[in-house]
Amino acid sequence: MEIREYKTYNESEILRLYRSVGWTAYTDCPDALRKGFRNSMLTLAAYEGNQLLGISRTVGDGHTIVFVQDILVFPEHQRKGIGSALLQTILSRYSHVRQIQLATDNTPKTIAFYKSMGFCEFSKIGCCGFMKESCD
């Protein structure tokens, strides 16, 4: 497996990945997703040869805050260290940044994954998070 920057947006490949994990809010707005990729700070992909296994996308200013927007791995390739490798690459790249944040599904699986990678819930540091969602 190789982690490298994802520089050439392949819409069918990306939509297939997002659909495979049930993230239809993104696939329902493919133009917004395309623009999101284009404007991301860093997009990484995990490949085995030319086969896409997973992807990560970060946004932010790269100095005071980085937000891990997406980490997705095709279901048949999950639990093989791919998500960990993508996230570890982000953490290494932005080790100088004070705040690296993310939002995730509220499931035991995802919570355990991010805790294993050194993340804590906002409530542990006296904070909470808010979100306003729309797709226009």
Please provide the spans of the model-predicted regions.
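Short amphipathic alpha-helix that is part of the acyltransferase structural core
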Residues: 1-28, 125
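Short active-site oxyanion
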Residues: 2, 98-100
